[in-house]
Regions:
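Glycine-rich phosphate-binding loop of actin/hexokinase-like ATP-binding domains
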Residues: 120-181
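Short loop/edge segments at beta-strand edges and connector loops
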Residues: 102-106
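A charged helix-plus-loop insertion that forms the helical arch/lid used to bind
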Residues: 74-84
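ATP-binding/phosphotransfer module of carbohydrate and carboxylate kinases, centering on a glycine-rich
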Residues: 1-59, 69-72, 90-100, 115-122, ...
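Hydrophobic "anchor" residues
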Residues: 24, 75, 144-145
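A short acidic/small-residue loop/turn micro-motif
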Residues: 31-34, 83, 151-154
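Residue-level detector of high-confidence beta-strand sites
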Residues: 27-29, 78, 147
């Protein structure tokens, strides 16, 4: 059996084909058209090209930067705005003449890492994607848990837990709320915190980590604050979901110094003072989402 996964991004649409062992046997990437009908055509053409190349008909899963509303059956909350309000799964199923499964891209990330990635074989896995924003997804026994409202995993838009006096800044999040986790533990939040504490105007976490590795004390303090905030935020997740593993993706996942610090701090913040949940770096990097889309058709 061949599984096709499609990642519908804002600038590119990517397809991969996985064989029955999860080995990649085909990949192609094309620019994303900014029109709904053209997006449908592009996805259909990619699937048909892959099937022609491999001489096989396969299952199709699609990851999107939004969700299918369980109430209306239409896409919502997508930053690729031209797919909002559209019955994407139904339209693709009709055009490809088979059921097409569609899920949030963060959920696809979680499914990928839970199926054959960093958390392979674990039951309940939370996938965390931290870059310019802060998203998440839940895989339960290798399958998406979207929840009754279709927003399962949106941990970044809860308030930062156990805030201290210096953190009560009433920082507004793009979602309209204040002091969301995302405003502190996103890559953007990491840079803003460093700049506010130093008066500098750096533009990326890479610059901060370069200073850290040169022994700069302000960078060391910024990373300590960041890891403490991330550990507090993840501890809330663990207290509620108690996952076997949390897998980190996105740009911040490339900072290797984060993992041991956060793993140790979880013992401080998780109820009971002991945490067995593993905090892991992703295995498949930027390919994890598209692989997870393919794995929406899980192994039987």
């Amino acid at each position: 059996m061949v599984r096709f996964g499609v990642d519908l991004g804002g600038t590119k649409i990517e397809l991969v084909a996985l064989d029955h062992n999860g080995k990649e046997v085909f990949r192609k990437r094309v620019p994303t058209p900014k029109v709904y009908q053209a997006t449908l055509t592009t996805i259909v053409n990619l699937v048909q090209e892959a099937e022609s190349h491999l001489n096989v008909i396969g299952s199709v899963g699609v990851g999107i930067p939004g969700v299918i509303s369980p109430f209306t059956g239409l896409v919502k909350n997508a930053n690729s705005t031209w797919i909002n309000g559209q019955p994407l799964d139904k339209d693709l199923s009709r055009l490809l003449e088979r059921e097409v499964r569609v899920a949030n891209d963060a959920n696809c990330f979680a499914v990928s890492e839970a199926t054959d990635g960093a958390a392979a074989g674990m039951g309940l896995v939370f996938g965390v994607i931290i870059g310019t924003g802060c998203g998440g997804g839940i895989a339960n026994n290798g399958k998406v848990h979207g929840g009754g409202n279709g927003i399962g995993g949106e941990w970044g838009h809860n308030p930062l837990p156990w805030m201290n006096k210096s953190e009560f800044q009433s920082t507004q999040c793009f979602c309209g709320s204040h002091d969301c986790i995302e405003t502190y533990v996103s890559g953007t939040g990491f840079v803003r915190d460093f700049n506010q504490s130093t008066g500098l105007e750096l533009t990326s976490g890479v610059e901060i980590m370069d200073l850290f590795r040169q022994g700069a004390e302000p960078a060391k303090q910024a990373l300590e604050r960041y890891c403490d905030r991330l550990a507090r935020s993840l501890a809330h997740l663990i207290n509620i979901l108690d996952p076997e593993a949390i897998v980190l993706g996105g740009g911040m996942s490339n900072i290797d110094e984060i993992y041991p610090q956060v793993q140790q701090l979880l013992n401080k913040y998780v109820l009971g003072g002991e945490c067995k949940t593993k905090f892991l770096k992703n295995q498949f990097g930027c390919s994890s989402g598209v692989r997870g889309a393919a794995w929406l058709w899980a192994k039987d």
